[in-house]
Amino acid sequence: MGDVKLVASSHISKTSLSVDPSRVDSMPLTEAPAFILPPRNLCIKEGATAKFEGRVRGYPEPQVTWHRNGQPITSGGRFLLDCGIRGTFSLVIHAVHEEDRGKYTCEATNGSGARQVTVELTVEGSFAKQLGQPVVSKTLGDRFSAPAVETRPSIWGECPPKFATKLGRVVVKEGQMGRFSCKITGRPQPQVTWLKGNVPLQPSARVSVSEKNGMQVLEIHGVNQDDVGVYTCLVVNGSGKASMSAELSIQGLDSANRSFVRETKATNSDVRKEVTNVISKESKLDSLEAAAKSKNCSSPQRGGSPPWAANSQPQPPRESKLESCKDSPRTAPQTPVLQKTSSSITLQAARVQPEPRAPGLGVLSPSGEERKRPAPPRPATFPTRQPGLGSQDVVSKAANRRIPMEGQRDSAFPKFESKPQSQEVKENQTVKFRCEVSGIPKPEVAWFLEGTPVRRQEGSIEVYEDAGSHYLCLLKARTRDSGTYSCTASNAQGQLSCSWTLQVERLAVMEVAPSFSSVLKDCAVIEGQDFVLQCSVRGTPVPRITWLLNGQPIQYARSTCEAGVAELHIQDALPEDHGTYTCLAENALGQVSCSAWVTVHEKKSSRKSEYLLPVAPSKPTAPIFLQGLSDLKVMDGSQVTMTVQVSGNPPPEVIWLHNGNEIQESEDFHFEQRGTQHSLCIQEVFPEDTGTYTCEAWNSAGEVRTQAVLTVQEPHDGTQPWFISKPRSVTASLGQSVLISCAIAGDPFPTVHWLRDGKALCKDTGHFEVLQNEDVFTLVLKKVQPWHAGQYEILLKNRVGECSCQVSLMLQNSSARALPRGREPASCEDLCGGGVGADGGGSDRYGSLRPGWPARGQGWLEEEDGEDVRGVLKRRVETRQHTEEAIRQQEVEQLDFRDLLGKKVSTKTLSEDDLKEIPAEQMDFRANLQRQVKPKTVSEEERKVHSPQQVDFRSVLAKKGTSKTPVPEKVPPPKPATPDFRSVLGGKKKLPAENGSSSAETLNAKAVESSKPLSNAQPSGPLKPVGNAKPAETLKPMGNAKPAETLKPMGNAKPDENLKSASKEELKKDVKNDVNCKRGHAGTTDNEKRSESQGTAPAFKQKLQDVHVAEGKKLLLQCQVSSDPPATIIWTLNGKTLKTTKFIILSQEGSLCSVSIEKALPEDRGLYKCVAKNDAGQAECSCQVTVDDAPASENTKAPEMKSRRPKSSLPPVLGTESDATVKKKPAPKTPPKAAMPPQIIQFPEDQKVRAGESVELFGKVTGTQPITCTWMKFRKQIQESEHMKVENSENGSKLTILAARQEHCGCYTLLVENKLGSRQAQVNLTVVDKPDPPAGTPCASDIRSSSLTLSWYGSSYDGGSAVQSYSIEIWDSANKTWKELATCRSTSFNVQDLLPDHEYKFRVRAINVYGTSEPSQESELTTVGEKPEEPKDEVEVSDDDEKEPEVDYRTVTINTEQKVSDFYDIEERLGSGKFGQVFRLVEKKTRKVWAGKFFKAYSAKEKENIRQEISIMNCLHHPKLVQCVDAFEEKANIVMVLEIVSGGELFERIIDEDFELTERECIKYMRQISEGVEYIHKQGIVHLDLKPENIMCVNKTGTRIKLIDFGLARRLENAGSLKVLFGTPEFVAPEVINYEPIGYATDMWSIGVICYILVSGLSPFMGDNDNETLANVTSATWDFDDEAFDEISDDAKDFISNLLKKDMKNRLDCTQCLQHPWLMKDTKNMEAKKLSKDRMKKYMARRKWQKTGNAVRAIGRLSSMAMISGLSGRKSSTGSPTSPLNAEKLESEEDVSQAFLEAVAEEKPHVKPYFSKTIRDLEVVEGSAARFDCKIEGYPDPEVVWFKDDQSIRESRHFQIDYDEDGNCSLIISDVCGDDDAKYTCKAVNSLGEATCTAELIVETMEEGEGEGEEEEE
């Protein structure tokens, strides 16, 4: 490989990169330098400071040097060189001179190579001379207007090409297929050309170009390294052109070469190729098209004109040029070049003379008036993303401008080189503000305080200039000097101002609590009027003022507080402005509030037109940010939205800046405006997007700015925290208890921090408590006091990121009082500034901020507001959608479709099945409407109307996939009824419906309805549509039909009359009667006028009432309407028409109309309207429905992760979130009775009954007959039997269980069905009883002269209630009767005072709250005193703890030839676990007793795991470790023969009644544990599952223990860096959870946890669930604060402290543990103070309860040995009922073995998830349903999450996920729409791993050709 040199140069900069070939071979060890953030060219004013900065990477660390004219630059004088951490570097040139201009070369070198980048410094004035053009420097404060638009093309004319979807980067493996796809629009149909680099691609065997479903597709089969490069899709038509590029790269390609693309295989030693890299603004074909058509790439001479510059093409009209400019994508990236041959390639960018432009373009407003703030025009720059190596942004600063030469060189806009800073000072201090201003001519500087000029005053204020700086000096600051100061610099070019604040703190003054000297007064106003609320407040310090409306913070009004007078100004009052206004005043001593009621009377409709245009307030006001920017931290590749809310009169104009440079709208940066809200959307952030973002707003009255820092972080594995359900703001009274709840998610599970007013809550106060139920966290404030009020913040953190949410707690009727000093007062600061939305959701520290209420003047118009006379030109930057739609709104004829659509459509009633059979006649016009509207790219979450409290921020933070054109969720094919306008209105981004407000997306086929605002919407007039649509779009004919044409019939319907146009006056006819009810005349034709006199218009006798309903409860709305003829009823929710579905039942019985929803969801909240229509007119009434959140205990986990559920949960049939328009039926003669799906109107609650009692379960049903009722249990239909009876009737069904037994427990489901649908309900039945007898045979051990220890098993079933105690009964040979001996709680008892000449038998009964069980089996006859010689278990040979018995260590090989039954007698079962079962074995030869661990191993992987465990145990021959002595394998069965230990688990032994726990015993146990683990570590092995269950006592009397269960053990030696992701949450170390390398110290953490619990009975990290436990472990926070540690020695605490270190390097090892002073203590002579065992008992009870959860548990556990009994060598003479076989009944040993193996219950082994059935690609028709089915295997049961492209799917009525007990998983998508066309992925995860499968859903919409030919021609 030869040297590679890449050079890119222009008239501004030159960049070159070199690669040293000698370093390539050593790439894995070293890395050549690479500029990951290269420095940029600068254009600086003379005298200013220039700073080149960038970032370089490489290994070793590269050295950065700077050169100019071949000479190195050294740091000193005006030049400052700096190299920072992580490769950052900079060159700073102070006081730039003319001679400093020129090119600077930055070189980064290390041992692996060198890189260079050349940049250019242009000093203002020199640049113009160099190019022969005047230059306009880009400064922070200057302005320019959008170009003027004098003429516009016809609305039906040509449209330049556009990209509707983005071309994404493709990364494939070599040999795979690479696929690029994008969607384009334009008229006429654009011609598509694909290029690689600049060379057009020709179809071949490997390269195919096609169009699929409107997508342009390029496929490259068998990708190799020659195919790597940048591919461009070029689209051209007669109206313009557009192009978009993306890179194809091969996965695994050497990282040093990945930044280049091999473009040619040159054989020359030197090849020089020059290409142009300039954007042409011409709308006709330029060089790129010419290259595509001629397939040649000409090479112009350097410095000359490009080849197309000489073409004498006619100058295109200015408007075409403007549209082309607007529509053009961002600058095509420079083509990177990959060189692998022995040659040198230079890529040179040619210089292009800028195109002349008409002077003054864009300076005038539409009315021709000059702008009030003139500013020199500035060229638009198009930031180009080039994350590749050494990329540059090359921008022609003077392109496309023709500026007169005169006066430009000698003038410059004012600029602040340095600005005054905000200060806080004490009274009487001297304050000095300094600023430095530049500009030509020299600007004049003026100072202002709160808008009032500040002038020099002798002895107090000095204003002067010194050494080029301007100063304002306050000699003695007073409190009255506090406020906002501003400085204005102005010259002939314009003016610029900046502002800051001064806070002068009063010296020690007597503090006074707030109080009102005058309070608010009630008032009444007429809609549209302004009003002011005023009160006087006093207090020291000055109280903070917060205004509330109906208890919620006000976001849109202007408030002032001057001289103790607080005022709230409401302009242009709306009906929703009425309510209770509260002024809340607070300071450090307390808070006080006063309230007033404001009534807003509606205007008469005759004056409706008066407020169609906003009334401009008379007094200009400077801009104010109601919501500013806040700092953001996001992941690389995330989508970010920054939103501000700004008010002012006239409406301010806004620009966005990044690090002081103005941001231009491009493919990556979008600007959006919704009324007073302005947003900057970054589609995909890169590290170079890090920096300070500033939003600057100005109008004629002043300007203001806000800024924040965006930090782009490298991605981590996992998911950033987010709120499943957000908390709500709370208003409470003194003394009440308050709950603030939220549900959270994240991976790893986040830690939760609660803060008030920015400070962490202190747990020591005792006034609050934080509760957790799985992922639901609740803050409980008991008996709230005034100091509890304030802003509460919930901060979530994990290693991926953090998220926060704020809510406010406000107190009602607080009396002013002084608080004790030191008490922290509440703070309600930020409430007005948008800190908390009206829904209480709070502001999230993410890029996307949800609006609360609509801003003032906004209504529901997103892009039309505020444009009045200023029009499009006044707007700072237009969004991309302002092309033909913006023109169309001005010229299209306004048409009223109500005449045709509202009546005279004869239809026939069709069922859904009928509709699906006639798709050819059912024409869906939405497909055509959708193509006319080209919406912006929005996230999937923004398209959905979701609850204010449930927002999924992953759509912001996750890496986005290919952008798709959003389409609202659609409905089945339209029936012959009112057409659906949602596809027009839904094309624009919707406002989320919040606080009961509505997106109001549809007009209900009546444009007039849009004039009535919904909820908080501002009246916007009948001609203004809702959402983001233009008026012309709203009223545009459907399907591209001509406006004057007859509407195409839908279904079999034929319209009776032609579409008639309506005047604007007719559209405005709309009469309001009262607030909640509206009646109007629908007709404008003669026929309709005649029909009015033939009947009575509808009227509501009973109106709808506002409703509050809890989530999951039934919602019922009813109203009564009278009319003649009978009216047709239409229901709408938030403007969307409802229809009967499986979830929503609409009914009409006579005059009673109702809506019924069985289980209300958050999406059911909003404004419901009932519209009644007949020929005589129409009426409507409405109500607001609020769906309150379910209680915290009912909140579920993150909805997108779905766990397998039992068969009892039947999937409900899906409904739709966005339902179709209701059919319009002919006016019936008699009121029809609507057919209804079945409803279950009565059903029992969960029941608990005693065994033997009878149970009746009755469900009452209603609906259209016939209805079939079916009872099921666990998804299987219940068959009648002697115990169960089913009785069905017309109105219900009853299930009777005559005598309930334990097997009748479970979940019962009643399924009711008719032809219209189905419904189901479930009830849980619990049968309680006395417990079963204790299992097995009681066993006597430790037999002495007059005592013994009796032990037994617990009951196999506790009867539905926990066993409370055991009753022990005794039989002796003298009395020969059974009598009760004692009662105890544990499963062992020490029996005393036995006589040596008697024989005894024992039996045990279990007792719970329902009674006493039958007795257990009888023990064997036992005598005390001298025991006969008999074989003994070696573990019982000696109780002397100091002497270990002899152990027969064996190296085990697995016997595959013989069976376990050949050598051992298999006796009773001792226990079972997930691995299999444990049986007692007696060796035939020696009669020794062993334990047999029987595994079921079905796969090779499972067998290998068991073999690995045996192999590890062969290395672990130590007295403290349980020994494996034999092993057998036969087919799927593996048996390990193990040493038996009978003392039970260590902690079970400790809580025995007869055990005395002291610190001495703890030392003995910990010493043995350390010895055993030390030996394990010396063999190079880690245990990884140390926990109490795996520490077994040798017997029930001594203190010797053994460690068991090596199923998770791993060899560390030779393993390199080992990472695992398993263990028991409570005992696992932080590095395991974080998936970091583990070591021997990982076991030491577990030892520390065991020791902590052993000495205290408390667990340091146990939470209420595993997620909380894992979070506690990750944070590694613990203490000895509990009183349990009062009795523990300091040595013991020190021992624990040195083990529970988060950094594993700082933990003790086993050798150090054994040498620790605590374990070195003399246990024989030390003081033994008894420790309490109560906490240990509670801990064990809690741990047993927790084991029923879904913890990440270890495999292969031998903890069941805790219940081993019957340790004597004799076989039971009677046999054991629990034994798997009875040897006497079997004929041969072979039968014995076979019968045993069959008896071992097949328990599932642990298996990584896999798909036994995968999802398949689907192709469906729009409007139908799609279903993906798969089957998932794995154990533990995998959890499932579905993805649409890269977005996780949350279950809703549109997406339903079903996952049953058998592993069948389905995703059902109802009412499929074009937006559902995507790739779907099912991901299954359990503790062993994950699996995914993917399929594509293709949605067929109408053919592209249909409707296209019907465009209007003028």
Swiss-Prot record:
GO terms for molecular function: actin binding; ATP binding; calmodulin binding; metal ion binding; myosin light chain kinase activity; scaffold protein binding. GO terms for cellular component: actin cytoskeleton; cleavage furrow; cytoplasm; cytosol; lamellipodium; plasma membrane; stress fiber; synapse. Changing residue 1491 to S: In AAT7; decreases kinase activity. Its cofactor is Mg(2+); Ca(2+). The modification Phosphoserine is found at residues 305, 343, 365, 947, 1438, 1759-1760, 1772-1773, 1776, 1779. Its main location: cytoplasm. Disulfide bonds join 182-233, 435-487, 535-583, 742-805, 1119-1170, 1830-1882. Smooth muscle and non-muscle isozymes are expressed in a wide variety of adult and fetal tissues and in cultured endothelium with qualitative expression appearing to be neither tissue- nor development-specific. Non-muscle isoform 2 is the dominant splice variant expressed in various tissues. Telokin has been found in a wide variety of adult and fetal tissues. Accumulates in well differentiated enterocytes of the intestinal epithelium in response to tumor necrosis factor (TNF). Residues 1464-1719 form the Protein kinase domain. The modification Phosphotyrosine is found at residues 231, 464, 471, 556, 611, 792, 846, 1449, 1575, 1635. Can probably be down-regulated by phosphorylation. Tyrosine phosphorylation by ABL1 increases kinase activity, reverses MLCK-mediated inhibition of Arp2/3-mediated actin polymerization, and enhances CTTN-binding. Phosphorylation by SRC at Tyr-464 and Tyr-471 promotes CTTN binding. It is linked to Aortic aneurysm, familial thoracic 7: A disease characterized by permanent dilation of the thoracic aorta usually due to degenerative changes in the aortic wall. It is primarily associated with a characteristic histologic appearance known as 'medial necrosis' or 'Erdheim cystic medial necrosis' in which there is degeneration and fragmentation of elastic fibers, loss of smooth muscle cells, and an accumulation of basophilic ground substance. Belongs to the protein kinase superfamily. CAMK Ser/Thr protein kinase family. In asthmatic patients, overexpression promotes actin filament propulsion, thus contributing to airway hyperresponsiveness. Some MYLK variants may contribute to acute lung injury (ALI) susceptibility. Potential therapeutic target in the treatment of burn edema. This is Myosin light chain kinase, smooth muscle.
